[in-house]
Amino acid sequence: MKKLMLICAPVTSRSGYGDHARDLVRAFLKHDKFDIKIWDVNWGQTPRNALDGELDKNIIDCILPEPKMDSRPDVYVDIRIPNEFQTLGKINIGITAGIETTAVSSNWIDNCNKMDLVIVPSEHSKDGFVKALYEKMQQLPNGQQQKVGELKLEKPIEVLFEGTDENVYKPIDNSSLNLVDDIKEDFAFLHVGLWGAGNYGEDRKDIAKLVKIFYESFANKKEQPALILKSNQATFSILDRE
Protein backbone atom coordinates (compact mmCIF):
# COMPACT_ATOMS: atom_id res chain seq x y z
CA MET A 1 0.00 0.00 0.00
CA LYS A 2 1.26 3.46 -0.93
CA LYS A 3 1.94 6.10 1.70
CA LEU A 4 -0.64 8.90 1.86
CA MET A 5 0.55 12.36 0.77
CA LEU A 6 -1.55 15.50 1.21
CA ILE A 7 -0.50 18.53 -0.84
CA CYS A 8 -1.83 21.95 0.15
CA ALA A 9 -1.29 24.35 -2.75
CA PRO A 10 -3.03 26.74 -5.19
CA VAL A 11 -3.00 24.12 -7.97
CA THR A 12 -5.86 25.69 -9.93
CA SER A 13 -4.56 29.26 -9.63
CA ARG A 14 -3.21 31.29 -12.56
CA SER A 15 -0.19 32.54 -10.64
CA GLY A 16 3.48 31.86 -10.11
CA TYR A 17 2.78 29.70 -7.08
CA GLY A 18 0.08 27.94 -9.09
CA ASP A 19 2.56 27.08 -11.86
CA HIS A 20 5.11 25.90 -9.32
CA ALA A 21 2.52 23.77 -7.53
CA ARG A 22 1.36 22.12 -10.75
CA ASP A 23 4.95 21.30 -11.75
CA LEU A 24 5.56 19.64 -8.39
CA VAL A 25 2.26 17.74 -8.41
CA ARG A 26 2.97 16.40 -11.90
CA ALA A 27 6.40 15.24 -10.70
CA PHE A 28 4.91 13.47 -7.67
CA LEU A 29 2.29 11.79 -9.87
CA LYS A 30 4.92 10.72 -12.39
CA HIS A 31 7.00 9.02 -9.69
CA ASP A 32 3.89 7.15 -8.52
CA LYS A 33 5.20 6.51 -5.01
CA PHE A 34 2.36 8.07 -3.00
CA ASP A 35 -1.41 8.06 -2.80
CA ILE A 36 -1.80 11.79 -3.48
CA LYS A 37 -4.61 14.01 -2.28
CA ILE A 38 -4.72 17.75 -2.94
CA TRP A 39 -6.18 20.55 -0.87
CA ASP A 40 -6.59 23.30 -3.44
CA VAL A 41 -6.40 26.77 -1.89
CA ASN A 42 -6.86 30.23 -3.38
CA TRP A 43 -3.98 32.56 -4.22
CA GLY A 44 -5.20 36.06 -3.57
CA GLN A 45 -7.80 37.01 -6.16
CA THR A 46 -6.17 35.23 -9.10
CA PRO A 47 -8.46 33.08 -11.29
CA ARG A 48 -8.73 29.40 -10.40
CA ASN A 49 -9.20 28.00 -13.89
CA ALA A 50 -5.66 26.97 -14.84
CA LEU A 51 -6.33 23.23 -15.12
CA ASP A 52 -7.44 21.66 -18.40
CA GLY A 53 -10.30 19.18 -17.94
CA GLU A 54 -8.68 16.58 -20.21
CA LEU A 55 -4.94 17.23 -20.02
CA ASP A 56 -4.93 17.69 -16.23
CA LYS A 57 -7.47 15.01 -15.32
CA ASN A 58 -4.92 13.15 -13.17
CA ILE A 59 -4.46 16.29 -11.05
CA ILE A 60 -8.17 17.10 -10.89
CA ASP A 61 -8.95 13.56 -9.69
CA CYS A 62 -6.67 14.14 -6.68
CA ILE A 63 -8.38 17.34 -5.51
CA LEU A 64 -10.43 16.94 -2.34
CA PRO A 65 -13.99 18.30 -2.47
CA GLU A 66 -13.55 19.41 1.16
CA PRO A 67 -10.39 20.13 3.18
CA LYS A 68 -10.65 17.11 5.48
CA MET A 69 -9.07 13.66 5.68
CA ASP A 70 -10.14 10.37 7.27
CA SER A 71 -6.59 9.70 8.44
CA ARG A 72 -3.44 11.67 9.11
CA PRO A 73 -1.21 11.94 6.01
CA ASP A 74 2.15 10.20 6.11
CA VAL A 75 3.62 13.18 4.25
CA TYR A 76 2.19 16.70 4.17
CA VAL A 77 3.51 19.14 1.55
CA ASP A 78 2.60 22.81 1.93
CA ILE A 79 3.36 24.94 -1.16
CA ARG A 80 2.70 28.48 0.05
CA ILE A 81 4.42 31.33 1.87
CA PRO A 82 5.81 30.27 5.27
CA ASN A 83 3.36 32.22 7.45
CA GLU A 84 0.65 29.90 6.05
CA PHE A 85 2.54 26.63 6.68
CA GLN A 86 0.70 23.99 8.68
CA THR A 87 1.84 20.69 10.21
CA LEU A 88 -0.86 18.19 9.28
CA GLY A 89 1.25 15.13 8.52
CA LYS A 90 3.62 12.72 10.19
CA ILE A 91 6.31 14.35 8.05
CA ASN A 92 5.82 17.99 7.06
CA ILE A 93 7.54 19.69 4.12
CA GLY A 94 7.24 23.40 3.35
CA ILE A 95 7.94 24.55 -0.21
CA THR A 96 8.16 28.29 -0.80
CA ALA A 97 9.67 30.76 -3.24
CA GLY A 98 11.01 32.74 -0.31
CA ILE A 99 11.46 36.48 -0.63
CA GLU A 100 13.00 38.73 -3.29
CA THR A 101 15.14 40.50 -0.67
CA THR A 102 17.62 39.30 1.96
CA ALA A 103 15.30 40.11 4.89
CA VAL A 104 13.17 37.12 5.91
CA SER A 105 10.63 37.93 8.63
CA SER A 106 10.78 36.35 12.07
CA ASN A 107 7.27 34.96 11.54
CA TRP A 108 8.47 33.06 8.48
CA ILE A 109 11.47 31.66 10.35
CA ASP A 110 9.28 30.60 13.25
CA ASN A 111 6.88 28.72 10.97
CA CYS A 112 9.69 27.09 8.99
CA ASN A 113 11.03 25.69 12.26
CA LYS A 114 7.75 23.79 12.66
CA MET A 115 8.40 21.86 9.44
CA ASP A 116 10.69 18.85 8.99
CA LEU A 117 12.13 20.20 5.76
CA VAL A 118 11.97 23.47 3.82
CA ILE A 119 12.53 23.63 0.05
CA VAL A 120 13.25 26.82 -1.92
CA PRO A 121 14.07 27.40 -5.63
CA SER A 122 17.39 29.26 -5.37
CA GLU A 123 20.56 29.76 -3.35
CA HIS A 124 19.57 33.43 -2.93
CA SER A 125 16.32 32.40 -1.31
CA LYS A 126 18.08 29.84 0.89
CA ASP A 127 20.63 32.41 2.07
CA GLY A 128 17.84 34.71 3.19
CA PHE A 129 16.50 32.03 5.52
CA VAL A 130 19.85 30.70 6.70
CA LYS A 131 21.28 34.13 7.54
CA ALA A 132 18.17 35.51 9.24
CA LEU A 133 18.74 36.08 12.97
CA TYR A 134 16.44 37.69 15.52
CA GLU A 135 16.69 38.27 19.24
CA LYS A 136 14.05 36.64 21.42
CA MET A 137 12.92 39.23 23.95
CA GLN A 138 10.95 38.87 27.18
CA GLN A 139 8.92 41.60 28.86
CA LEU A 140 10.09 42.19 32.44
CA PRO A 141 7.80 43.38 35.28
CA ASN A 142 9.45 46.82 35.15
CA GLY A 143 8.51 47.20 31.49
CA GLN A 144 11.98 46.64 30.11
CA GLN A 145 12.91 44.03 27.50
CA GLN A 146 15.39 41.26 28.23
CA LYS A 147 17.04 39.02 25.65
CA VAL A 148 16.28 35.36 26.35
CA GLY A 149 17.61 33.74 23.20
CA GLU A 150 17.86 33.90 19.43
CA LEU A 151 15.47 32.98 16.64
CA LYS A 152 17.06 31.41 13.57
CA LEU A 153 16.32 28.64 11.10
CA GLU A 154 16.90 25.31 12.80
CA LYS A 155 15.43 22.90 10.25
CA PRO A 156 17.03 21.53 7.05
CA ILE A 157 16.58 23.69 3.94
CA GLU A 158 17.32 22.51 0.41
CA VAL A 159 17.37 24.13 -3.03
CA LEU A 160 15.25 22.58 -5.78
CA PHE A 161 15.58 24.69 -8.90
CA GLU A 162 12.51 25.38 -11.02
CA GLY A 163 12.96 23.51 -14.27
CA THR A 164 11.73 24.46 -17.73
CA ASP A 165 9.43 22.57 -20.07
CA GLU A 166 11.47 22.66 -23.27
CA ASN A 167 8.40 21.73 -25.29
CA VAL A 168 6.98 25.12 -24.38
CA TYR A 169 10.00 27.33 -23.71
CA LYS A 170 12.30 26.98 -26.71
CA PRO A 171 13.95 29.13 -29.39
CA ILE A 172 11.50 30.25 -32.07
CA ASP A 173 11.66 32.03 -35.37
CA ASN A 174 11.52 35.76 -34.67
CA SER A 175 9.49 36.27 -37.82
CA SER A 176 6.56 34.56 -36.09
CA LEU A 177 6.38 37.32 -33.48
CA ASN A 178 4.31 40.32 -34.50
CA LEU A 179 5.84 42.18 -31.56
CA VAL A 180 9.26 42.22 -33.22
CA ASP A 181 8.07 44.71 -35.84
CA ASP A 182 7.21 47.17 -33.06
CA ILE A 183 10.65 47.01 -31.42
CA LYS A 184 13.14 49.22 -33.25
CA GLU A 185 15.97 48.81 -30.75
CA ASP A 186 18.67 46.17 -31.29
CA PHE A 187 18.56 45.02 -27.65
CA ALA A 188 15.61 44.65 -25.28
CA PHE A 189 15.12 43.89 -21.59
CA LEU A 190 12.05 41.80 -20.68
CA HIS A 191 10.35 41.98 -17.29
CA VAL A 192 7.57 39.53 -16.42
CA GLY A 193 5.61 39.99 -13.21
CA LEU A 194 2.35 40.86 -11.54
CA TRP A 195 1.89 44.60 -10.94
CA GLY A 196 0.64 44.64 -7.38
CA ALA A 197 -1.48 47.08 -5.47
CA GLY A 198 -0.26 50.34 -3.97
CA ASN A 199 1.15 53.68 -5.00
CA TYR A 200 4.59 54.38 -6.43
CA GLY A 201 7.20 52.31 -4.59
CA GLU A 202 4.60 50.17 -2.81
CA ASP A 203 4.20 47.42 -5.41
CA ARG A 204 6.06 44.34 -4.14
CA LYS A 205 7.76 43.84 -7.52
CA ASP A 206 8.46 47.60 -7.66
CA ILE A 207 7.70 47.77 -11.38
CA ALA A 208 7.04 51.52 -11.40
CA LYS A 209 10.51 52.17 -10.01
CA LEU A 210 11.95 49.71 -12.52
CA VAL A 211 10.59 51.89 -15.33
CA LYS A 212 11.96 55.06 -13.69
CA ILE A 213 15.44 53.62 -13.17
CA PHE A 214 15.48 52.20 -16.68
CA TYR A 215 14.84 55.64 -18.16
CA GLU A 216 17.42 57.27 -15.88
CA SER A 217 20.08 54.63 -16.57
CA PHE A 218 19.91 54.85 -20.35
CA ALA A 219 18.84 58.48 -20.81
CA ASN A 220 22.21 59.66 -22.12
CA LYS A 221 23.28 56.50 -23.92
CA LYS A 222 23.85 56.72 -27.66
CA GLU A 223 22.32 53.30 -28.31
CA GLN A 224 19.34 52.86 -26.02
CA PRO A 225 17.74 49.45 -25.38
CA ALA A 226 14.03 48.72 -25.18
CA LEU A 227 12.12 47.69 -22.06
CA ILE A 228 9.29 45.21 -22.53
CA LEU A 229 6.87 44.76 -19.63
CA LYS A 230 4.69 41.64 -19.58
CA SER A 231 2.44 42.24 -16.64
CA ASN A 232 -1.02 41.80 -15.19
CA GLN A 233 -2.98 42.68 -12.09
CA ALA A 234 -4.42 40.22 -9.62
CA THR A 235 -8.02 39.86 -10.73
CA PHE A 236 -7.58 39.77 -14.52
CA SER A 237 -10.83 41.73 -14.72
CA ILE A 238 -11.94 44.16 -17.43
CA LEU A 239 -11.92 46.91 -14.79
CA ASP A 240 -8.26 46.19 -13.98
CA ARG A 241 -7.31 46.29 -17.65
CA GLU A 242 -9.00 49.66 -18.07
Question: What residue spans do the PLM features occupy?
Answer:
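N-terminal pre-catalytic "stem/leader" segment of glycosyltransferase-like enzymes
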Residues: 1-72, 215, 226
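Short beta-strand segments
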Residues: 6-9, 37-40, 77-80, 161, ...
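Extended catalytic core of nucleotide-activated donor transferases of GT-like folds
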Residues: 6-8, 45-129
